[in-house]
């Protein structure tokens, strides 16, 4: 759920590090193909993100898949989406000198977000929601203002975005 482009995070060797330019281009094309199989809109939205990455004033050296981090260890009664868990990862990466990009589905960039932890609802047919507190809302806004938060459009597959983000500085 996290990729650091120098190939290591602490003592953990990451599997995608060191791909050739040709291999990275192939990964990018595969992601575009996957998006186009879903819909033309999905492909166009992913192309916009590709443009965001190419045109951004700096290169990101770490990409954080926000939902996976925010829901880490939250499958218990009372578990919830926790932006402060994302902040903890971002803070460590920035302290190590990385320029961090956080990807989050747009539905998690609002004041009220879905809660998809295992014990969020008593019945699978119900969707629980949770209100973010002021600190969590301010955190998302701060990341947005710093240009390090990308809100994946609704109904788009967010995994394609963080994976694409990792292909620009490997």
Predicted segments — roles?
Residues 1-170:
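Noncatalytic, typically N-terminal accessory segments of nucleic acid-processing enzymes
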């Amino acid at each position: 759920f996290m990729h650091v482009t120098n190939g290591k995070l602490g003592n953990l060797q990451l599997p995608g590090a060191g791909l050739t330019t040709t291999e990275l281009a192939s990964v990018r094309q595969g992601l575009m193909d996957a998006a186009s199989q879903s819909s033309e809109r999905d492909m166009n939205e992913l192309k916009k993100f590709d443009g965001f990455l190419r045109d951004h004033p700096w290169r990101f050296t770490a990409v954080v898949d926000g939902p996976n981090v925010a829901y880490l260890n939250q499958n218990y009664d009372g578990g919830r989406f926790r932006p402060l868990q994302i902040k903890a990862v971002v803070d460590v990466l920035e302290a190590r000198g990385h320029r961090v990009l956080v990807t989050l589905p747009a539905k998690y960039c609002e004041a009220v977000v879905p809660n998809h932890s295992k014990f969020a609802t008593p019945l699978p047919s119900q969707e629980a929601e949770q209100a973010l507190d002021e600190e969590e809302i301010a955190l998302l806004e701060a990341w947005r203002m710093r240009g390090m938060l990308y809100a994946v459009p609704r109904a788009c597959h967010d995994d394609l975005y963080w994976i694409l983000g990792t292909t620009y500085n490997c």
